[in-house]
Amino acid sequence: MYKVKVYVSLKESVLDPQGSAVQHALHSMTYNEVQDVRIGKYMELTIEKSDRDLDVLVKEMCEKLLANTVIEDYRYEVEEVVAQ
């Protein structure tokens, strides 16, 4: 069994109004050191699949559902879950 951590964020070329609003709020709270804020999504999937097919499966899920690849980038990390 594997735990897959998926991170989805807007591409650098796409305006992030939510990130801009958070940055503005932080500046109004005197956290002026913050130069940029980008908002994204984080998902954890538990998958029971052979490791041989796992990368193909995760890429397919990301590109078909979890990320809008027109405006979003994604990356993921895989860790094996050891049964106790």
From Swiss-Prot:
Catalyses which reaction(s): N(2)-formyl-N(1)-(5-phospho-beta-D-ribosyl)glycinamide + L-glutamine + ATP + H2O = 2-formamido-N(1)-(5-O-phospho-beta-D-ribosyl)acetamidine + L-glutamate + ADP + phosphate + H(+)
EC number: 6.3.5.3
Keyword Nucleotide-binding (UniProt): yes
Pathway given in the UniProt record: Purine metabolism; IMP biosynthesis via de novo pathway; 5-amino-1-(5-phospho-D-ribosyl)imidazole from N(2)-formyl-N(1)-(5-phospho-D-ribosyl)glycinamide: step 1/2
Main location group: cytoplasm
Disruption phenotype: Cells lacking this gene show a purine auxotrophic phenotype and an accumulation of FGAR due to defective FGAM synthetase activity.
Gene Ontology terms, MF aspect: ATP binding; phosphoribosylformylglycinamidine synthase activity
GO biological process, one term: 'de novo' IMP biosynthetic process
Keywords: ATP-binding, Cytoplasm, Ligase, Nucleotide-binding, Purine biosynthesis
GO CC terms, sorted: cytoplasm
Annotated localization: Cytoplasm
Protein purpose: Part of the phosphoribosylformylglycinamidine synthase complex involved in the purines biosynthetic pathway. Catalyzes the ATP-dependent conversion of formylglycinamide ribonucleotide (FGAR) and glutamine to yield formylglycinamidine ribonucleotide (FGAM) and glutamate. The FGAM synthase complex is composed of three subunits. PurQ produces an ammonia molecule by converting glutamine to glutamate. PurL transfers the ammonia molecule to FGAR to form FGAM in an ATP-dependent manner.
Binding partners and assembly: Homodimer or homotetramer. Part of the FGAM synthase complex composed of 1 PurL, 1 PurQ and 2 PurS subunits.
Family: Belongs to the PurS family.
Protein name: Phosphoribosylformylglycinamidine synthase subunit PurS
This protein's encoding gene: purS
